[in-house]
Each structure stands twice: as C-alpha cells, then as structure tokens.
Amino acid sequence: MFIKKEIDLGQGKVITIETGKMAKQADGSAVVRLNDTMVLATVVSSKTPPPPSQDFFPLQVEYREKYSAAGKFPGGFFKREGRPSEKEILSARLIDRALRPLFPDGYYQETQIIISVISSDTINDADVLGGIAASAAIMVSDIPFANPMSEVRVGRINGQFIVNPDTEELQRSDLDICIGGTEDTICMLEGEMKEISEAEMLDAIKFGHEAIKKLCAFQKELAAEVAKPKRAFAPTVAPAELVAFIEANCAAELKALAYTPLAKEERSDRTKAIYKETIAKTLEHFSSITAEEIAANPEKALCQSEHMIDECIHDVEKKVMRHMILDDSKRLDGRTLEQVRPISIELGLIPRAHGSALFTRGETQALVTLTLGTKKDAQSVDTLTDDKDKRFMLHYNFPPFSVGETGRVGGTGRREIGHGNLAERAIKMVMPAEQEFPYTVRLVSDILESNGSSSMASVCGGTLAAMDGGIPLKKPVSGIAMGLIKEGDRYAVLSDILGNEDHLGDMDFKVSGTRDGITACQMDIKIDGLDYHILETALEQARKGRLHILDVMTEAIPESREDIGKYAPRLTSIQIPVDAIGMVIGKGGETIRSITEETGAEINIDDDGTVTIACSSPEGTKAAVETIKTLVSKPEVGTIYMGKVRDIRDELGAFVEFLPKTDGLVHISEIARERIAKVSDVLKPGERVKVKLIDIRKDPRTGKTKFALSIKALLDTDQPAETNGEAKPARD
C-alpha cells in the first residue's frame, strides 16, 4: 500500500514521507524528502532467534551518499563508490546513537538499517532526514519499536532559530546542532557553536524539540495508516529465586568494593573475582534442578545459565553503584559529584613535533602532537553538499593498550572518527583566520590511558599542543564529560565521569568551550524522561568544571607561544598581479619548480594572486621572495639579473633570457674586459650568467622594446645578483 504524507515545519521547510513504493521486500522502508534532497531508508531484522549466550543488540546502521544523487561521478579509477567516507560514518553514528536506546531491552535480533541518499540538491544535508527515514521505516515494519524518533538540525541567524538550515544559512549561523528525540524526551545531541551560553543552548534544544514532536506525531499517523502488526517479542526475565540468591551472595561484597576508592585495574580485578565466585556458587546451588522440573517449568533452566547469572550480577553491581551515588553522593573513586580528577600537563616533550602536550586527568591520558603544513597539505573534501580544502584537522587514535587489552591495530574505527570529529569541532571555533595564520594544521591525539572522557582530554591536549606550537588561538578551549544517575524523581549529575559511571549510568554529555561559551557538545541518553531542569543542571555543572580545567591549563601556558616551533615551515605571503601568475609558474611549471629546487621553498599561488612561500630557512624564504618580486616587476636599467644564454651569434653577441619570456642582447663588446674573437669561445647555450640591464629602447622600425645587457659591467663591481631570470640565485 503506497502512502505519501507531507508536513510543514515552518520557515519554508516542508518534509514529505512516503512508503510502499520502494524496497517493498525489506521489513520496512520509507522515503523522506526536503526540497530536492531525498533519502531512502530500509530496515531488516532477522527472524532467527539469537544464541542463548548473546547479550548485546547487533544493530548495524549504514548511511551512504550516492554521487549520482547530485549528478556527479565518483573520483578514482573505478568510478564507483568505495568504502564509507568520514562524512558518511559520522552521519551513520548520528542516526545509530539516537535509535539504539529506543529498541526494547533484551531485543537481540540482528538488525540492519541502510540509509541511501538518492537525490541531493547540494544545499540540504541529508543526515537528519536519514534519521527520520530510518525511524519511519521501523515504525511501518513489524519490528518492535514503541515510539518514533526524529532528528532535526537547528541553526541561529541574528538571534532567530532555524529548523533544518541549508548550507547557505549555516554559513551565517552561529550554531549547528543536530538533535534526536521522541515526543517526550531528547535522546541525542551533537553540534558546534560560536561560544554560546548555557541558556542559549537550552533554548536551541527546546526549539528543536518542538519540531521533533511534530515529526514524531507525523510518523505515528503514517504507521497507523500502514497498520502492520508487530512481531511477538517478550524479553527474557530472570527467575525471582535466581535474582534473590545472587543478591544475597554478592550484593554486600559489591557494595563494599564500590565504597572503596581503587585504581581502575585493581577494581576490575576484584570485580571479576566476585563475578567468578558468585557464578560458581550459583551454579552449584541450582545444580539439583532436574530435567523433569525444567520440562514442567522451562524458566528454571535460566537458573543454570551462566549467561543469565552474569547478567543478574551485573544488575546488582549497577544497582549498588547507583544507590551509593544517589544516597550518599559518593563516587567509585571517592570524589564528590562535581569534583574533577587531578590534572597534570607537560608541554613540548616531543622534540621534533611542531608542538606537543601530554594531558593527564586521573587515569585518562592523551598525547597530542601538532604538525604545521602548507596549503598543499590541506585535505580535499568532496561531499554532496561541500567541496573544499580542509585546513584544520584533529585525528584521534585509541589503541587497545590504553585500556590494558590486546586488539586489532589497523584502520580507523567509527568511534575514533566520531571522537576526533567532536574534538576537532570544539577547537575549530577558536582557530585563527587563514589570513592571520595561513598554515594547514593537523593535531593527532593518541590516547595512552583511558578511564572515561578521552575525547575531552583530546580537546584539552589539542588546545595545549596548539598553544605550545605557537598557533594564535582566539581563546583556549577545555572539555568535560558529564554523567547522570536517575531513579524516579531522584537524580545526580556527575562531573568528569569514569568509564564505569558511563557504562552503568544514564547519560554521557560532553561539553567543550572557552570561558565565554560553548563551542561543541555531544550527548547520548539511555533513559526516557530527561527533563530540561536536569539538562540545565548538567550544563551549569559542566560550565564550572570547564572553567576549573581552563584554570589549570592557563597555569601551564598562559597564552600561545610567540613563535612557531623551530622545525615548522615558515610561511611568508606576498601579493602579485593576477596577470603575472602565469609568469611565476612558467611553462609547464618550469619557473616555479626552478625556484623550489634552488631555494628549498614550497610555493602556493591562489587565484587572487596571493603567493604563500614555505621554507624552513630564512635565507631560502628571502631568496624566493626576491626572485618572485623581480619576476613580476618591470625591467629597470641598472638592475642585476641571473639569466640563461638562449642563443649565440659569434660576431654579434649572446641573447640572454633575464626574465621569463624576456630576452636581452649582451653585445660582444659587453662580454669581457678584453676583446674576444668569437662569443662561443666564452659562452655556451644554456649557461647561466650574471647580467646588468644597461639600456632599454624601442626599435623604430618594429616598435618592439629591446634590452641591452652587460656582463663586463659587473666584472669590476662583482655585485651579487638581485634576481634570476630562471628564478634561481646567482652562482659564480
């Protein structure tokens, strides 16, 4: 049955959802459209029961942008889409993080959601549309999913909030936030801002939630019209006698352990020991259950399931920690709710890096290094809505040894890409303008230890490494991860959460910013019922923690160093006439390559005539600048050049190219002090010679300008060459 519905979100943003036309063999499918941007979402969930030992939800979310959607050809030899781009991975994570907590607890069927961008108007990003389409596809399927989820992007121009701004509007917006939620609550948040206040952030979330409510109600209407029955699903529940036995045998030990401040590794070892002992006791206690009893009551088999016993112990551990925090305002490492772990900072410890910082907060440690490059080092970004050179990037690496484990070491994982992107967005807002600091900047954050909040350690370490490397940041940025424990109406907001507090808690809310406002945020919620008062509390508590961390960072380095690292390339910019660009580049790049070879400088020329020269030595920079300036200048009498002999006329003289495409004659009488019989006895074609321009005149017959050069005039003075027709310094 084909159904098509339309909703107007205001401000000219009309969204259409249809189902029943495309991908009908999937469990559910939906097409969402905004202007000429369209996404197709499909969902399929396995009907084969998962193995009894499975304790996780194998959800796979794939987001793919087809180049054909925008009438483009993919790059590369094969001319087809390859592995997911960074943009596609980040979009998939946005959708995954919002949908995952909404599936029923205990639903472990293998489920795959594929979002395909099938049309793009190149100005409306399809990522939030993909979230709506994915939720709609699940709603019209038979997969158990009680409440729809919707995603919107919120911008603000001149104080006015905008829902789903296009790329042109985002250029003028001071914030870019993606919000995912249900009719009742927000479950996902991610974005970047230009130092907005906590109150402004809250207003943006409320504005976005109003649009989300409309879209969720819209999806419910669509699902009601399709009216597809949901498949039967009942989560496995542990028998009451099993729960009671486990609580009686391990709750006291787990509580005593929770109230004992320990390092991560020691706590983990002692927790594993309690698990092992409790599992053994439980299996022994229920070993007397017979096959006949299980046949009469299949639930009793769960009492002999090591997997179910493990889950029950985990529930007790979670309950103990949460009650400790709510009842006693005490945390696993002994801190108060708002206390930040001890911080240590070391700068400049990597000698050859252009800047470096080792940032340690508790048992989380990030080593961040800075590399400065030229425009040629910028990353080329080609997406459906963007085609640019990216001159600032932050890469995040999370090796398995950082958590005391072994594991695969290879390509960058989705989590690493997501964490790096968040840290990059936080610092990007305070990076200097290209005109002020024309370098390409790469920060690499290697996590050496992790016990929570490693992405925020990357923000702090990245800021410190940038300042150590002499980048004139507008302001320093710090970051902090907030947690939440909520039971009914009782709740506690935690500052600078540990890994266990993230795992056993209800929220992971990362906030980065300067002293004056927020620059980036990311939030994931595992529960329903998060109200705005809790968000307001979390934002204010995050502000206090952020300022505390900034105080520690400022003690380590009050402001950016005055100069860049000694091994960083030095950039110098000069302006040349646009019509002289070809002269500097030369035929087939001959001239510019020549300058690079002789001076060691790397040269980039923009279309507006801006020439950027990068060289590690001041001498090379000076030589390159002088050569380029002379190349684009008009010939002047008395100026000395380094030229190349182009042609020899034995009885007349030598024609020397002293500027690109500009030849002059060195008369035979101007070659040497003594008389010479043949020019070829002294000069050879291709030879470089130092010449002085002694006369400029027009040929009365042809009207062409002729240049008279002299070698002899320099033999007495022995002056150094001021330039080089081939853009190379003089050599005697």
From Swiss-Prot:
Cellular component per GO? cytosol
Annotated KH domain ranges read: 569-628
Q: What Enzyme Commission number does this protein have?
A: 2.7.7.8
* Function as written in the Swiss-Prot or TrEMBL entry: Involved in mRNA degradation. Catalyzes the phosphorolysis of single-stranded polyribonucleotides processively in the 3'- to 5'-direction.
Q: What is this protein called?
A: Polyribonucleotide nucleotidyltransferase
List each copy of the S1 motif domain by range. Answer: 638-712
The cofactor named in the record is: Mg(2+)
Compartment list:
Cytoplasm
Looking at the keywords, is Acetylation present? no
One GO biological process term = RNA processing
Organism source for this protein? Chlorobaculum parvum (strain DSM 263 / NCIMB 8327)
State where Mg(2+) binds.
502, 508
